[in-house]
Amino acid sequence: MYSFNTLRFYLWETIVFFSLAASKEADAARSAPKPMSPSDFLDKLMGRTSGYDARIRPNFKGPPVNVSCNIFINSFGSIAETTMDYRVNIFLRQQWNDPRLAYNEYPDDSLDLDPSMLDSIWKPDLFFANEKGAHFHEITTDNKLLRISRNGNVLYSIRITLTLACPMDLKNFPMDVQTCIMQLESFGYTMNDLIFEWQEQGAVQVADGLTLPQFILKEEKDLRYCTKHYNTGKFTCIEARFHLERQMGYYLIQMYIPSLLIVILSWISFWINMDAAPARVGLGITTVLTMTTQSSGSRASLPKVSYVKAIDIWMAVCLLFVFSALLEYAAVNFVSRQHKELLRFRRKRRHHKSPMLNLFQDDEGGEGRFNFSAYGMGPACLQAKDGISVKGANNNNTTNPAPAPSKSPEEMRKLFIQRAKKIDKISRIGFPMAFLIFNMFYWIIYKIVRREDVHNK
């Protein structure tokens, strides 16, 4: 009986002990503060009752806000020489510190917020100084990111498509290297309030496999500062320079090789018989017109600039060679027909010669004498008073030398034809050699001497 009572006593004490412990835990749980909901936390952090004013920059009346920028290039293309601009699609990322947004009440180290919250915080007034057109992306939702860290750091990322101005120097076109810039500038805050700077690591990133149709995007990207001075103050500005080397493949196929073949085609006339005037003239005119069309086509996609481009020199020289080939046949034809003109002139002169003109004949001494032989009167018909005939009046008995016999028409024809053929033979060698020398100078000058260095840009 005694042992039973003792056991019941210990059991009762155990029940009372656990009951008291459970009661204390329940009281502690009821007295512990409840975790704050995300909505309550955001209202406390940047709501109306938080005292946060998005119209006032961080560190107001204090040091300027340092904004670190980074861009990621999704696509790069549509480089237009006529309008001198280029199109690019990027992620623009800005990071700065806003002490008013630092927190300890929430367990997460960072908060990814809805883009609608962007209107509730202060943001830098960044714009692109050389922008000609731009738009945001809203498919399927606003392509914007807002992230706030525990220490008050803010990350703002946005996807935009830009059309930026890119002044081009086309003197070496199509063997040129162009430098296109992207300038990021503050619109309203001077450097006393806001300073832009490039991110130390990976300030400019390019998507893997990014290729351009006519250019090679150089890996060297110059990151510079371009502080702007206006009447309203000194404004922060940073810029990125993209070096683009043009690929010649398209222009070799579409311009250089066709024009080269046209020039070579014009030389075929040197092997065509000089009497085949329709064939040689037709070939010459066709090549000239084709070369003119080719030259006009090369300028169609380029702006009207005041200086001479490399492609202009090539087209002009090719047109000159083609036109010279046509003029060469004109010279050949003229020389080959000279004997006919000379014979026609001689016949015309003999036809209009009057018998009275034979009264005077010029000997080698240039003395004029009457010639009575035209009237059937010999020298003995006229006697002077002293018995000396008139013909012997100059007191010399020497006879005039016989004139050199003139060449026959057939000999003259062969002479002029040989001269014309000689012009063709010289042209067969001279034209290709001259064009080869031009090519040597042209490619050496534009590919070696005047080759552009991106580091000197």
UniProtKB/Swiss-Prot annotation:
Annotated residues that bind glycine 1 are located at: R93, S157
Q: Where does glycine 2 bind?
A: T232
Where does the UniProt annotation place the signal sequence? 1-28
Where does it primarily localize?
Answer: membrane
Enumerate the UniProt keywords alphabetically: Cell membrane, Cell projection, Chloride, Chloride channel, Disulfide bond, Glycoprotein, Ion channel, Ion transport, Ligand-gated ion channel, Membrane, Metal-binding, Postsynaptic cell membrane, Receptor, Signal, Synapse, Transmembrane, Transmembrane helix, Transport, Zinc
CDD domains per record: LGIC_ECD_GlyR_alpha (cd19009), LGIC_TM_GlyR_alpha (cd19060)
State the Pfam families in the record.
Neur_chan_LBD, Neur_chan_memb
Positions contributing to Zn(2+) binding: E220, D222, H243
Known glycosylation sites? N66
Q: Which family does it belong to?
A: Belongs to the ligand-gated ion channel (TC 1.A.9) family. Glycine receptor (TC 1.A.9.3) subfamily. GLRA1 sub-subfamily.
- Role summary: Subunit of heteromeric glycine-gated chloride channels. Plays an important role in the down-regulation of neuronal excitability. Contributes to the generation of inhibitory postsynaptic currents. Channel activity is potentiated by ethanol. Potentiation of channel activity by intoxicating levels of ethanol contribute to the sedative effects of ethanol.
UniProt name for this protein: Glycine receptor subunit alpha-1
Question: Organism, per UniProt?
Answer: Rattus norvegicus
Record gene name = Glra1
